[in-house]
Each structure stands twice: as C-alpha cells, then as structure tokens.
Swiss-Prot record:
It comes from Caulobacter vibrioides (strain ATCC 19089 / CIP 103742 / CB 15). PROSITE patterns: UBIA. One of its GO terms (biological process) is heme O biosynthetic process. Coiled coil: none annotated. Carbon 2 of the heme B porphyrin ring is defined according to the Fischer nomenclature. Its main location: membrane. This is Protoheme IX farnesyltransferase. PANTHER family: 4-HYDROXYBENZOATE SOLANESYLTRANSFERASE (PTHR43448:SF7), PROTOHEME IX FARNESYLTRANSFERASE, MITOCHONDRIAL (PTHR43448).
Amino acid sequence: MTSDSAETTPLRDSSETARWQDYFQLMKPRVMSLVVFTGLTGLLAARAPIHPVLAAIAVLCIAVGAGASGALNMWYDADIDQKMRRTRGRPVPAGKIKGEEAASLGVVLSLLSVMFLGFAVNWLAAGLLAFTIVFYAVVYTMWLKRWTAQNIVIGGLAGALPPAIGWAAATGSAPLNAWLMVAIIFFWTPPHFWALSLYVTTDYAKAGVPMLPVVKGARETRKQILLYSLILFPICLSPVLTGLGGPIYLAVSGLGGLVFLLLAWRVFASKAGDAADPRVADRALYDVTEDEKAAGAKAARNLFAFSILYLFALFAALLGEAVTGVRPLELLK
C-alpha cells in the first residue's frame, strides 16, 4: 500500500461516517426517540400478550415511520430552516444532503414502515401509522405550519398518536385508555412549544412562520400557555380513573402536574417574549427592563425544559407499572 492510499483511506472512512450521520440527523433522532418511547409505552401499557418479535417489529416500524416523517419535514422546510439560527445547520439547508434525496428517503421509509407493520403485525396499527405520517408531513408541514397560529395545536395530533399505534399493535384495537395517552401528549404540546417560541420569536418571525407569539403576541401566548396547562392537569390525572395508571403514576402526575402549573404561572406572570414581539414597532410600549427580559426568558426556558421531563416521567411511570405488574387503581370501577 502506498503512503497516499494509506492517507486517503481514513479520510474516505471519515467522510462516509459523516454522511451516515447526516442521514441520521435527517430523521430527527430526538423526536424519533420520544415517539419510540411513547409508542413502546402504549404497546406495553395495553398489558396484552404479544410475541416479543412482533413487539420489536412494531417498535421498529414506529421508529422508521417517525424518521420518515422527519426526513419529509426537513425536505419541505429547507427554505424556512435556512433562515432560522436554530435550524440552519440541519442537513438539507446546510447543503449536506440534497432536497430530493431527503424526499426520496422519506417516501421510501414511509411505505416500508407502514407495509411491514401491516403485514407483520396488524393493519389497524399500520393505518394509524400511515395517518400519522401523512398528517405530519403533509397537513402540518405543508399547510398548518405556514398558514395558522394554531399550527402546533392541530398539528400536535401527529406527535400524540404513537401510544395508540403501540396499543393497536398489541391488541388490534384502540380503546379509551389508548386515546387518553394521546390526549396527554396532545394537550402537552402547546405549552411545551409555545414556551420555546417565546424565546426564539425573532427566529420564527424572520422565517415567516406564524407561531402564536408572532401573530398574537407574547401576552396572548402566555395566557394560552396557562390555559392549556390548566386543561392538561386533569387529563394527566385521568388514567388513574380508567384503569390505566396506578399509584406510582398518580404520584408522578399529581406532583409533576403541580410543578408544571407553577412554572406555567410564572411564565404567565412574567414578561417573557415582550421585548421580541414583532408586532410592535415601538418597544417602549412594553416597558421591559433587561432584568425583566432575562427573568421572562428564564421562566420560559424552565417550563420548556420541565415539560420534557414531565412527559417522560408520566410515560415512564405507565411503562414501569406495566412491566412490573403494578395494579392500576381503577377508581371509577
């Protein structure tokens, strides 16, 4: 082997590794991991007999379907992502992967995940997965995200469906308890994303994305965060009434829900996002001091960070109780 070939081989290997990493990032691994976790929770919370191989196939298909949605989203949103500091480093806007490659990968993985889930497990689960992919990639990405301030409210349904897919994979049905898990994620989504949008409002405004703070302002956004947090609290407690959650879940949802409400109240009472409100030309109208600006940003960041922990804890409690055989409370039975 010549010295030149010895030097180029590591470079080629490094380039190929980076290429695979770009494709992996295209599938939004953070979002995919949450989807897999909630889908697995739905599958096991059903407490139904399912062969381990079929369970693994179901979870894999959910993961691939989520990744396919992410790839399609990144393909279509490349123009928006390029304008936002938070997203301009993604593979497509950064020029690491061509848009048509991302689109092709998304379509192929979508078809494979749905068909494989249908033939190997059942068609109800496959149908729900197909609906989720289409709703996220088409209804949310191509329409809602660019046209309405309610984009993440309505579009949140796509991210909320994995527990129902998992439950359907295990049982061939999707009863009330499956949809309670969907409802938890659905009503969790607005305060979670609006808390984020309060401290990246400028990015969204620059990209022309009609997030609530951009269209209605920071004050209205803070009101909506508190409203949805108040709605979320009883919904998170409801699984203990229907035979889904046990004592561990009750403790987690109750205590965690109170902390969530406290953090939502702090955001509501703060001036988070006021200084960046793109609708107001004269910032003096808001009379926001630097200390108030920093305190508001901190309140929004704290809620955003805790919301992730809270959702994880809720589903971890359901998953843990199902795996260990902790008996649900069934307070309404």
